[in-house]
Structure formats: C-alpha cells, structure tokens
C-alpha cells in the first residue's frame, strides 16, 4: 500500500491553494493574538491574552455564568392525581389559585381519554473521534480533556489504540475485514450478530484519519497490565466499537391521557423490549436505565382517583459548563453562521487536537477555574470579556473566517485580500481606542 501511494502521488502544485489557506489561518491567528493582547493589556494595565479561539471560548463560559447569576427563579404549579397504580400530572400552571381550584374539583372517577403506545428505536451513535471520547470520559470518569488526551496518547504509543487526534467518527470500507476480525475476538458468532456493522463505514466521512479503535493485536491478545486510568479509556473505546456494531435499543413507550374540565393530565411509561447496544453502555453508568411501567389501559377505561396534590416547582437556570458540555459547544460554535453548501476544513472553535489545550491554557492564565466538574469564569476572565470587542469574542468571526479560508483553499478567494481584511479590522479597533 505504501508503494501504491508513492506511485500515485499528486503534484505539489495541486495543494498550493490549500497551503495558502493554512498559512493565512496561522498568520491571522498571530495578528489577532499579538495585537489585541498588547492592546488590552496596555489599555487596562493587566496581563491580558486574547486569541481567536480562546477568547470566544472564554466568552461562552462567562456568558453562561452571567445567565446563571442573573437568573430569577419563578414558581409554577402542577396538579397531580393519584390512582392505585400510578399518577398523572398537568402541564405547568402559573397561578396557584387556579391549581388549587382544579385540585379541589377532581372527582373520584375519571375516564381515560387516550392511550398512545409506540415503539421507540434508538440507533447507536457513531464511533469516537477525539472530542467525543473526551466528552464521554468526562461524563463517565470525570477526566479532563487533557487527561483523556494524555491517557490516549500513552495507549497509542503502546500500540493498543489507533491514532488519537482524529476528527472522524467513521471508518473506510477497506477496514471491514479487520473490524470483523476484531469482533470475532469478543466471542464466536458476535460478528454475525453485529447488525449495525455497515453503519460505521463511510468513506466520505473520513478525513485524514479514521475513528479511534483498539488495535487488532490488542483485541486478540488483550491490553495487558495498564494503569487504571488508561484501562478505563481502553475499555471505553473497545465498548464503543461493540456498541456501534450491535443491534438497536428498542423500547415500548406508553402515554395515558385524561382530560377533565378542559385540562389534560398525562402519565408516561417506558419499558425495554430489546437491550441491544445499551448492554455495552451499562457498565459505565452509575444508574441503570429507568423503567416506568404503567398498567394496561384502553380508551374509555375508568380510573379510580385516590386524591390530588398541588406541587410547587421552580424554573431552573441553565447549568454551568462542564468539560463535556464545553467541548460540545466548542465543536458546534458558529456552525449556524456557515453558509449552506460551503464545506469548511474546520468547524467550531479549535480542533480535536487543540481544544484540551485551549481549556488548560484558560485555566493556567487565570481566566477560568474548575469547581468540581464545572468550569467557571474568574473575575479576570469576566473583566476581559467585558472589554473585548464583540467582533473578536464571538464565534461568528470564526465562522466568517473559515468560510473565507475554505474559498482560498478552493482558489475562489485571495489570501492577500483575506489578510488585508484582518489587518483592517485590527487597525479600526486600535484607532477606536486612540481617539
């Protein structure tokens, strides 16, 4: 395959536009970081660091923290009616007076208005790229993104897993035989039961490197003795392969609806019919998948009501970012601002290989801090976001740049024009403060 690759090498000229695009990105990042860091540090007599990726990332954390700080809880009410076997509840009611009136009017018997039975089929998610693995490791084990990357790099150097810094969650078609051999190491006949095996092979979805897998040798011989943290990551990667190729999770869902005095009461139930891939997820969960079993009911059945309760609840603020949710937000940042039909090389803030470093850098520079699993903006971080221009703290700028860089790679836009625009934006900002 190496000889074949050498024989079919493309001309270097074919990649000149791609080179210009990559060079322009590096220069633009340098221009923004060098000029804006010095600008804001001099203006406010603080050691501030500004970057195209790190500042919008900090902005997302700071804005979320501000939303939580400014959130005012509002009470609302639900009326719950109790039968012998289960309870039904209303939707949100804003007035306690109305909720109390409704509760007092509930009769001793109510008729079932509707029963909705459905079969819910859930397919397994794709294989791991680096970001998806970092998110899963943070969710299941509390590992930071950097810790996961370090453990993964160690496993890679021990030849137990494939290349770690990938942004693809699929494999190429020519890997199918190898994957089948991997599955056969789990147990005889497993490969024949791998009903979703074809879903993980998509040539068009593989960029420079395919999804993260255990190596065939590791699957055949076992990973050997590993530090506990590395063992957790290896087991998670192996379980992901088995999960992605296994059958779907099939659940039976039931919704019972009762209408009274123009108000809808409902109860929902769910039971697992076929566990499928979920069997490989369970070992990593603290709690088993909850099942709520409702009695068999039909439209027109009479329910004997034992009582009714008015429950007060409160609206909830958004949750602080964890590394899991921040990585997802970085991956999706600015995606809605990319024009349809344009394929960009990089979407979101950073790359799978750099996002962990961005988070650690923000912590090291004192802009954010860890509070258990949460990531919080510090006073210094909040101060920086308050003073930085909206243009340079918004992920929209990243989307705009990536669209232009994509056009440069396609030969449809000039790198000189792109960099002139960057220089103009920076000059305008500096001139604004000089007035």
Regions found by a protein language model. Give the residues of each.
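Toprim catalytic domain recognition across nucleic-acid enzymes
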Residues: 1-334, 339-367, 372-374, 379-386
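Leucine-rich, amphipathic alpha-helical/linker segments
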Residues: 191-212, 393-434
